[in-house]
Structure formats: structure tokens, C-alpha cells
């Protein structure tokens, strides 16, 4: 048994679900690593046709790690023709509900999303390298319905080394530049400059040139 397989079987990985994703996404055509996208137990998959995975980094879905394991169910729904781009190793902990709509694109630069996240990507979502997202976050790049005469949504871009606190909501057309810190409970809509601390409903810049580690 090779090291990759042994490591996966020692974890909470669901081998059958992982194999299903590996085949359905077409990863088997270009990757020798069955566990590049590791689907953990209690994660429900709904997979459309013709969706693809790009990049060589890894993704863990429904991982029950972290300081306070919850053992809660997760789900991933991927629409027809959607694209998942893995530019850095990423973990999404258990309890997440993630919906990637038909033809949508979601890009992970490498980071961490805590338990019970709600992610709806109907257009485009980018999460940069080294970004961490707190518990119970909600990220939606669409309102599901559209006001007559309004501009089409542009998606959401979250830069590198961004810290998003717990129970934050990030709405369509938001752009968080590198190093932004989002206080817990904020509702984010719009563009925010690098190194800013934002808070409130709606979120506003409350401090500039902050650093975190």
C-alpha cells in the first residue's frame, strides 16, 4: 500500500465517494492521485455532467479536523460544465453546503474554511492563497433573482492572506484585496483596500494598514 493511499484510509475519507468524484470529474484522465480531491464521510455529492477540475493541488471536502470536530453532514452540488481550479491545497471542514452552478468557476488558492460554511457560486468565486474563513460564513455571488434593469453580477474575489471572521456574509460583486481582515458578523458588499479592517452591517473600513498572523 503506497503512502498516499495509507494516509487517506487512516483519515475520515470516504473511499467510494472520493472514487466517484475522481471518475465523474475526469481527474482519472490526468492525475495518478485518487485522493487529490478527498471526500470525507457524511459528505453528499450531486455531480453534473462535463464539469472539470484543474490544477495539481489538493482539496479536502467535509474534513472533520480543526480544534472542535462536529461530525456534521456536508454537501457539494456541482452543475453541468462547472469548473473547479485548485491552485493551492485547501480544506473545507464539515457542515459545509457548497453549490457550484452550471458553467460557474470557483478557484481555491490554498487555505482553510471552517465548519458550517455556506458557499453559492453561480458565476465566479476566487479565494486567494493563505486566506482563512471562519465558522458559519456565507458566501454568495448571486441573489438568485435579478432586479429588472440591474447589471449582471461579476462574482466575488477574495485576495491572498485575508482573514474572514465567523458568521460573516460576503455578497455578490465583493472584492477583498490582499490582507483584509473582516470582523465577525459583518455583511460585506463592495470593494475594500489592501490591509484594511472592516466591520459592521453593512461593512465599513474601521482601520487601515493592519497586519495579522
Located regions from the model:
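Domain-scale signature associated with acetyltransferase and cell-envelope carbohydrate enzymes
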Residues: 1-139, 159-161, 178, 194, ...
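Glycine/small-residue-rich pyrophosphate-binding loop that anchors the diphosphate of NDP-sugar donors
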Residues: 104, 123, 154, 166, ...
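Beta-rich strand-turn-strand
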Residues: 116-121, 168-180, 186-190
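Conserved catalytic-core motifs of eukaryotic protein kinase domains, centered on the activation segment
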Residues: 143, 150, 174, 208-210
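Glycine-rich NAD(P)-binding loop of Rossmann-like domains
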Residues: 150-161
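A short, glycine- and basic residue-enriched loop/turn
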Residues: 155-156, 173-174, 195
Amino acid at each position: 500500500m503506497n503512502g498516499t493511499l495509507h494516509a487517506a484510509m487512516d483519515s475520515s475519507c470516504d473511499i467510494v465517494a472520493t472514487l466517484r468524484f475522481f471518475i465523474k470529474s475526469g481527474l482519472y484522465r490526468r492525475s495518478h492521485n485518487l485522493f487529490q480531491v478527498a471526500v470525507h464521510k457524511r459528505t453528499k455529492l450531486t455531480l453534473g455532467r462535463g464539469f472539470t477540475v484543474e490544477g495539481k493541488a489538493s482539496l479536502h471536502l467535509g474534513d472533520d479536523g480543526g480544534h472542535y470536530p462536529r461530525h456534521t453532514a456536508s454537501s457539494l452540488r456541482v452543475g453541468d460544465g462547472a469548473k473547479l481550479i485548485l491552485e493551492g491545497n485547501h480544506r473545507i471542514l464539515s457542515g459545509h453546503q457548497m453549490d457550484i452552478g452550471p458553467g460557474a468557476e470557483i478557484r481555491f488558492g490554498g487555505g482553510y474554511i471552517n465548519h458550517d460554511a455556506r458557499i453559492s457560486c453561480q458565476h465566479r468565486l476566487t479565494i486567494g492563497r493563505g486566506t482563512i474563513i471562519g465558522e458559519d460564513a456565507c458566501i454568495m455571488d448571486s441573489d438568485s433573482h435579478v432586479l429588472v434593469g440591474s447589471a449582471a453580477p461579476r462574482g466575488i474575489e477574495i485576495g491572498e492572506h485575508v482573514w474572514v471572521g465567523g458568521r460573516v456574509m460576503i455578497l455578490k460583486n465583493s472584492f477583498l484585496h490582499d490582507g483584509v481582515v473582516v470582523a465577525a458578523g459583518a455583511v460585506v458588499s463592495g470593494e475594500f483596500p489592501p490591509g484594511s479592517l472592516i466591520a459592521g452591517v453593512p461593512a465599513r473600513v474601521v482601520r487601515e494598514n493592519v497586519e495579522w498572523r
